[in-house]
């Protein structure tokens, strides 16, 4: 049996959808409030998306299109991939990594779940 701390009690397909949604929201809004476990799971994926944005090749755009949700963002009516490549990636052009930070915040009132604020640096 797996370690209970590593089992998230959901299937892989569900987690893939949640991660895609959270990463897309993080890139569009700059920060999101979620549970600590989810924040830890999406940190590496968000940083990979920003690294793809820094490459700015056709192949990297296609990889980002494959992962990010294609929803119109609330920022200048651009979709999330275009916003990633045109606005977010140039900010981090000279940064080698560490594009996100996780800040632990007060536990959620209803079920006392550990909460965190994940934001772009």
From Swiss-Prot:
<dbReference type="InterPro" id="IPR047859">
    <property type="entry name" value="Ribosomal_bL17_CS"/>
</dbReference>
<keyword id="KW-0689">Ribosomal protein</keyword>
<dbReference type="InterPro" id="IPR036373">
    <property type="entry name" value="Ribosomal_bL17_sf"/>
</dbReference>
<dbReference type="InterPro" id="IPR000456">
    <property type="entry name" value="Ribosomal_bL17"/>
</dbReference>
<protein>
    <recommendedName>
        <fullName>Large ribosomal subunit protein bL17</fullName>
    </recommendedName>
</protein>
<dbReference type="Pfam" id="PF01196">
    <property type="entry name" value="Ribosomal_L17"/>
</dbReference>
<dbReference type="GO" id="GO:0006412">
    <property type="term" value="P:translation"/>
</dbReference>
<dbReference type="GO" id="GO:0003735">
    <property type="term" value="F:structural constituent of ribosome"/>
</dbReference>
<comment type="subunit">
    <text>Part of the 50S ribosomal subunit. Contacts protein L32.</text>
</comment>
<keyword id="KW-0687">Ribonucleoprotein</keyword>
<comment type="similarity">
    <text>Belongs to the bacterial ribosomal protein bL17 family.</text>
</comment>
<dbReference type="GO" id="GO:0022625">
    <property type="term" value="C:cytosolic large ribosomal subunit"/>
</dbReference>
């Amino acid at each position: 049996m797996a370690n209970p701390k590593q089992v998230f009690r959901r299937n892989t397909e569900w987690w893939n959808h949640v991660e895609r949604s959270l990463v897309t929201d993080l890139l569009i809004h700059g920060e999101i409030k979620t549970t600590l476990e989810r924040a830890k799971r999406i940190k590496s994926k968000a940083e990979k998306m920003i690294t793809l944005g820094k490459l700015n090749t056709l192949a990297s755009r296609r990889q980002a299109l494959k992962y990010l949700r294609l929803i119109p963002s609330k920022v200048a009516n651009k979709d999330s991939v275009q916003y990633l490549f045109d606005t977010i990636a140039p900010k981090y052009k000279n940064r080698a990594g560490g594009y996100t930070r996780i800040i632990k915040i007060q536990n959620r009132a209803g079920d006392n779940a550990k909460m965190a604020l994940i934001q772009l640096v």
